[in-house]
Each structure stands twice: as C-alpha cells, then as structure tokens.
Amino acid sequence: METWSFPDGNIANLVERRQIFDSHQDVNQRLQAHSSLMQRLALDKEMEGHQGCVNAIAWNSKGSLLISGSDDTRINIWSYSDRGLLNSIETGHSANIFCTKFVPETSDELIVSGAGDAEVRLFSLSHLSRKRSEEVAIEPVAAYKCHSRRVKKLAVEAGNPNVIWSASEDGTLRQHDLREVSSCPSAESSNQECRSVLLDLRRGAKKSLADPPKYCLVLKSCDISPTRPHQLLVGGSDAFARLYDRRMLPPLSSAQMRMKSPPCVNYFCPVHLSEHRRSSLHLTHVTFSPNGEEVLLSYSGEHVYLMDVNCDDKSIMRYTAADVPKHFCLARISGESKLPLPPAVPSSYQLMHRLDVYRNLVQAAARILEEGSNIYYGIEACNEVIDGKGPEVGHSVRHECLCIRAALLLKRKWKNDVYMAMRDCNSARKINASSFKAHYYMSEALLQLGKLNEALEFAEVAGNLASSTCEEEMVATIKGHLVAAEAERVKKDNEDTVRSETRHGKLRSLSDVLFRAELNSPYSESRYEREDSDYEEEMELDFETSISGDEGRDTESSILRGSLNLRFHRRDDSARESSSIDGAEGSPSSSSQNYYHTLQPEVAIDMKRRYIGHCNVGTDIKQASFLGQQGAFVASGSDDGRWFIWEKRSGRLVKMLAGDESVVNCIQCHPFDCAVATSGIDNTIKMWTPHAQVPSMVAGGIAGPETADVWGAIEINQRKLCRNRELVLPYEFLERIRMHEFAEGTLHPFECAQS
C-alpha cells in the first residue's frame, strides 16, 4: 500500500535549522515528538519495584524524577537518568493508591497521594536518605480524610505549592490548602465539617444533554489548565466532561448539606453520545492539551475524542439538545445550494505535488470501496485528505472524499462508525445539496440505526436524484431493506409484549440487594448517606438464577456461565425528579443562586477528532494523553496489553506497542525528552525511547518483538467494544459488590465483567 509522509518535515532539516537560526525552544519542542522518533519508540527499560498493579505515574517538573503509586499502597520514586529506584515509601494507605504527584515549587520534597481508602496524604521527603531502594514508612505531614469514597485523581497547578485538588467517587471535588489545616476528621465522623468542597456534584450527573442534573456524578478524573489555571476540567459517571471557571464558583463548603451543582462554562461530549442513556457510559480520563486550547476525553466502552476549549457562539462545534435530532433530519441542509469553488491555489511544485498526492489517495480509497478490502487503510487515506494539514483540495475532491469515507465507515461497522458516516454525509450535503451519494449513504446509515422513517425520506430524495440505472437499482435495494426491517420490527414488538406479560411480578428492588449487606457494614449510613440512592439510579432488578450452560458468554470475556441472570428496568423518572428536587438541600444564602442555577448551560462542544483502535472496557483509570510539549500526538492504553499512538491532527495511527501482559492504563510523556513511561496491571513500569533501528508501526515489550497484525489486533479490540453482552451491570453496582461482603449463603457466588 502507498504511504504518505507526516507534515513535520525531515528531522535532519530541523536539526540544521536549530544550528543556523538558533531557535532552540521551538525546534526542541518539535524534535521531542517528531514523527520519525515516534515510529522508532521501543522498550528501553522495565522498572521493577512494586508488588501490585501500578495505577499512577507522574513526572516532576524537571523530568529528573518519576513517581508511581500502586495497589501495594507504596509510592516509589525513580531516577530518570538510570531508571533506578531511589525510594520506596510505605504510605499507610489501607487501599489501592490511584493517584500521586509531586507538589510544584517544593524542590520535589513534597508528594501527595490519593487512594481507595478515601484519603489524601501529603508526605515530605526532606528527611529521607538518598540511598537507593530504601524502603521506609514515614508519617504523612497532612492527612485529609473528608472524602467518603475512593479518591481517583489529583490535580496541581504549575507554580503553586499551596493547593491540591482531589476528585472522588463521592461526587465532590475538594480543594486542600496546605497552609491551613494539616488534617481533618474522616467522613464517618459526626464532627466532620471540613469546608473544602469546591465542586459538589452529588446532584450533577445527567442522562442526556436535555435532562436536568439530578444524579451523583461519580468523579473519575480532573485536570487544571496549564495556561489558564482558573479553568478546571472534570469527568465522571456520565457522558459529559465539564469545564469550570474557579473564579466563578461558590465559596468552599462542607459536605454536610448537598448543594445544587454550579453551572459550568462548557460541556464537552460528542453529539452522538449526548442522548445515550446507558448507565455504563462514563469517562475514565480527561486532560488539557499542553497549550490549554484542547481537551482529550477517554470513555469506557468508547473511543478517545478531541475537542476545542474555545468555541465562540457561532462555532459549528457548539450544539444544544434541540440540535441533536437535526443530525438525522432531511430538512437540516434544506435550501442550501452548492458552495462556490475556492480561489485557485498558487502554482508551485510543492503545492501541485501535494494535490496530486491527495487525488491519488482519493482514487485509492475509491478502489478499496469497490474491492471491499483494506477498509481501514481507505479510511485513513480519506482522513489525510479531509483532515490533513495541506492546501485546499477543492470542494469537488472534498465532496467525493467525504462520500467515500462515509461508505467505507458503513461497510466497516466498528463502534459508532455509523455516526461518523452521518457526519460525513451532512458535510457532503453542505457542499452539494443535490448529491445522490450523500443522500443514499445517509439513508443507509439511518437504516443501520433503525431510524426507518428518516431513512425512507433520504432514500426517496436519493431516488429523485438518481441519474443512472445503477443508482436507481441501489435505491430500490435499500427500500427493500427498509420494508424488511419494518416487518422485523413489528414482529419483535409483538414478541416483546408477550414476554413482558410473563415477567410480571418477578421484580425486586436493586436497593434491597445492595443495602441489605450495608446494614452491618462500616460503610453504612454515616459513610454513604441514605440519600445516595441516586447512586444506583433506583433501578429495578429482575432477579433470576440460572444454571443452564446454554447461557455462556463469549470465551474472550472469561465470565462464568449462567450463574446469575440480572435484568434491569428503570422506574419512571418523574417521581424521582420530584423527590430529588423537593428534598432537603443546601444552597447559598443569596437568592441569586437560584437565578444563577437556572442559567446552567445546555450547550455542549462536539468532537473534532476521534482516535480509534484501542479497547477501554476493563478498567476505569485508563488514560489518554498528549505526547510532547506541542501535543502533536495522542496516546492511549488498551485492554489488550498494548498502547496506541495517533497523529492528533488526522487521527492516523502511528504506532502500536506491546506494553503489558494484560492492560495498559497510564501513559505519561517526559516533559522535554522523547521518552514515555507506561504502566498497567503488571507490577512494573516501562520506559520507552526512540532507539529502534528502523521506524515501524509495531513494537514489542518484555515478551520480545511484536509481530501481531496491526489491523487484526484493532479488529479484535473493536469486537470487544461492540460485543452485545447479555449481562451488562452498572459499574456502581459492581463497586458495591466489591466493597461489601454479602453474608454467607445470602447469594450464590457469581462473577461479573466490569462494563
């Protein structure tokens, strides 16, 4: 297959430019994550020192030290220069460490950790010996016990040694000022009045953009903008990342009274996920780009998405709940005419050569569509033309490329490919409102989504636009598929009606199962407020035991066969909403708070790029990170033990590396050098540097050279994402199962896969 170059140029020319023009800073930043170096990344060192999964890694500001936290409740400090272990600190945490960082501007003497025991601990390294591999237990200089659930992420502000932010699954983000109290009572304490709550989101989650926030937002991640430190980004148990301006938030409060969630500056969510009401859809990581202009979101059971922070009111990336149905509607582009061609491109050899490359890529993609093989390559070729950094290709070529990519996406059928195809069809219709291909492929996409009426409307228009016998036959075929799909839907509706009648009377409350074990648990009442039934979304449980071997799962999922069959049915939300709103609730004394809350935006920012290839379903700490000071590349861990690197601008896959025996969770790029640290389920940290002899798309880890077929590995990951499991449990339910031991004999043993 034909390959095409990256836009960052020849690395030798960059080095020469640095020597001639002495522009060290800019060139060094471009060199750090140059495409030729990314393609040469290989395992440099496997760093041993932990006895459990390594859940957190972070660099100090100079890049001389790496800190890590693990399930073994230890914090390790590593030397970057020789990859050696300097100190191993017994923290005193009673559960897994999920996050740890160096506190800025403290000469790397203060470190902070957050763990599954709901505590944030601060340690001073000033009295530690620099003797290597010294294992020591030191007392924390500060211990904050005010969270009631696991602390999943910490954030610090560059240049600020006084404040730490912690995000917890209890739905609060707290601000700890190190100049004030050095400790606080635990959340179970009757005198817990620690006023450190910056964001109270225990009623901040929403099922869709149109819904009011009323459920507990179980926080999984947070970040502070590196260029605008007043900007705070959080993500958790729904589809929406939220951007807040710390200057506009209410004063710090205690957790004794629940506050209405404050309005955010922006929501971030791909438009096709904004109306999904699946309780399993949630964010595992959110982060700012190095320049603070973009954010990266990683979803469980989904892909990684890039979005712009600064979108003005007229930006096409902004949308409201009312805009979502328009993406499926024929009238969305009505009245638009074909756009005028752009002005002529200046004639030069380089520009003409680049345009020739683009035309060749479009032709190659068209051949792939016709042949039906190498679909992934065809899509990436279209990505390069549509999203690449180059001269304007002209509306005609762009329209053709959009239609080809839409057709390839519909043929590939990976998760949410159908929504990406719809985006391309709508973009093509903006260029040419009379495009047969755009309307035909839109009809096919809507058919795949089961939106049969809308699909028929587009098929009718495509039939009117057909200019050949072949196109007329295509329309007739898809209309036949629509008729068959409608008949199948009617049949299924009738069967579902009969089945629902036979199930009547089998329901038990899920909260009965969960809270029965809680009554005798140390986590009951005082630790988790009874009001927190929002956490389970008050689902109903259809509880049936089954021992039939016919109900076994896919062998890849490693789930026990038929031991438990759980089906969930939601209650009517209307009763919940009224009880939630009418219940006791704290609020600021000023009456302006109610007015302020009514202005909570229902505007969200849509995606501008999707990164696909990895699998994120097994853990809720999986990161997606920018690589390099300019953030030109994006990386993510995966459940298959690999980690993936994409070019940020186009989404093009650059590298796939085998980094773990099971799962890669954490990826952190060195502040200045071309070096990347990764960790996961293994008890080691891997350091990756560009020392491979030749560039390649794959690289091995500790098991030796990676020889796996790239597209085959990605295909397996996508099947895992798309697998239609009969048993899909809300992860909140699984957390309760994990945290509470049921009385012996109460329930039969069973295993569940985290969704």
Where are these regions (language model features)?
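Loop/turn segments within WD40 beta-propeller blades
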Residues: 57-63, 101-108, 155-161, 223-229, ...
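A short helix->beta-strand "capping" segment at the edge of beta-propeller domains
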Residues: 28-52, 82, 137-139, 267-271, ...
